């Protein structure tokens, strides 16, 4: 239990840490990776190169300090972090390593301003946070391992099918190499794929949404090829596209994630996705359309038909199920793309154009896609009067959503 003095010191020094946050976290990662290079196998090194992980962690540290009087206000955030950590296989013995180098980085960057009292207060605050997360992660690990088909840590899977879904998205059907069943999951959850990346000389781990409904035998992930932009190409995603084939093996974590629908609810859901963000939505959609059926609105944005994954199956579902309304936006339609057949509206997803169709009593709204897309849709829903508690979103990698 933190003393009031400790809380006061942490709150008082939060603005200073925010001012120097990026430098502190950059120093922290340098120190930690030099002392423990094996942790490079856990952290996303692409995000390290781009500085995204540093920004996200600096912001998280500041948010924790700002809310230290009422940590329950951060419970949703901590739940997301715990699920991510569980999917990475984070171990309790790694927390003291992080704490040691974080405190050393604060001392190094702030110099004499980081007094013994300040370092002691932050050590206690970090220890308290670590205890909360370790408890949550232990519960997640045990819950997964106890379920039929469940496991803890990594399990070897075999690629049984590799299916192109568009010019940039490919689906992989994975079955356990041991021939056993797989644990069911909540529609919207993800698995982690661990694979050796020769270009880095490291194992790297990435999260991918499970893009089909649970069947107890296999999982499907749908992976976008990365590249062509200002950021480095996706190490793992492109490796899966170019070098992983049917019969090859990869390691998977059990499903985790707090972004999922309530399968027992009967209230409407509105799914809003951009690009490869449709992958968790497809799982949600399939389950929601089962008995008891519930009203579903699926809104998707893509550049055009060439990169619109699963479009024919979604159109067919919209024709088959009376409780499903589908709206597709293309912002760069091809000459052969026909409005009314391939897509419904030109331009970026604009929920204002379909306001009457998505403003449903007691509906929950789920958003997934690139971060700028999610910010835009979140703000648009808020402007339509949707309560924050009804809006749910998924971010893979560092959570830079709330800038």
UniProtKB/Swiss-Prot annotation:
Name under which the protein is recorded: Flavohemoprotein
Organism phylogeny: Bacteria, Pseudomonadati, Pseudomonadota, Betaproteobacteria, Burkholderiales
Region of interest: Reductase: 149-403
CDD domains linked: FHP_Ae-globin-like (cd14779), flavohem_like_fad_nad_binding (cd06184)
EC code(s) of this entry: 1.14.12.17
Entry keywords, A to Z: Cytoplasm, Detoxification, FAD, Flavoprotein, Heme, Iron, Metal-binding, NAD, NADP, Oxidoreductase, Oxygen transport, Plasmid, Transport
Family note: Belongs to the globin family. Two-domain flavohemoproteins subfamily. In the C-terminal section; belongs to the flavoprotein pyridine nucleotide cytochrome reductase family.
Membrane-spanning residues: none
Site (described: Influences the redox potential of the prosthetic heme and FAD groups): 84, 394
Pfam family, one: NAD_binding_1
Positions contributing to FAD binding: 190, 206-209, 395-398
Cofactor note: Binds 1 FAD per subunit. Binds 1 heme b group per subunit.
